[in-house]
Amino acid sequence: MSRAPISRTFTEGRLAQVLVAPIISEKATSIGEKHNQVLFKVLQDATKIEIKAAVELMFKVEVESVQVLNQKGKTKRFGGRTGRRDHLRKAYVSLKAGQELNFSGEAA
């Protein structure tokens, strides 16, 4: 028995909130060059499907796949007190061949 495809509709307001910020670091840049991937900090409750739809809507590119990871916040000392940084959810977005994302603000 095959399942019928589930139609998913997202509001543009929700999709605009899903992507919190791009992660631009040395590691993220090397991953982007090797595997044609882009890293984003996303909401804790964001799904892979929402992330894919948000990237395609905001940047007008085609997404091949999305992998996510949940990173626990580090325990750090602030003065004499111990605290914890916030937990983080990262999305590794693989772009289809020939697609490119540019964060510098210049037209590609």
UniProtKB/Swiss-Prot annotation:
Pfam families: Ribosomal_L23. InterPro entries: Nucleotide-bd_a/b_plait_sf, Ribosomal_uL23-like, Ribosomal_uL23/eL15/eS24_sf. One of its GO terms (molecular function) is rRNA binding. SUPFAM superfamilies: Ribosomal proteins S24e, L23 and L15e. One of its GO terms (biological process) is translation. GO terms for cellular component: ribonucleoprotein complex; ribosome. Keywords: Ribonucleoprotein, Ribosomal protein, RNA-binding, rRNA-binding. Signal peptide: none annotated. Gene3D superfamilies: 3.30.70.330. Belongs to the universal ribosomal protein uL23 family. NCBIfam families: PRK05738.1-3 (NF004359), PRK05738.2-4 (NF004363). This is Large ribosomal subunit protein uL23. It comes from Leptothrix cholodnii (strain ATCC 51168 / LMG 8142 / SP-6).
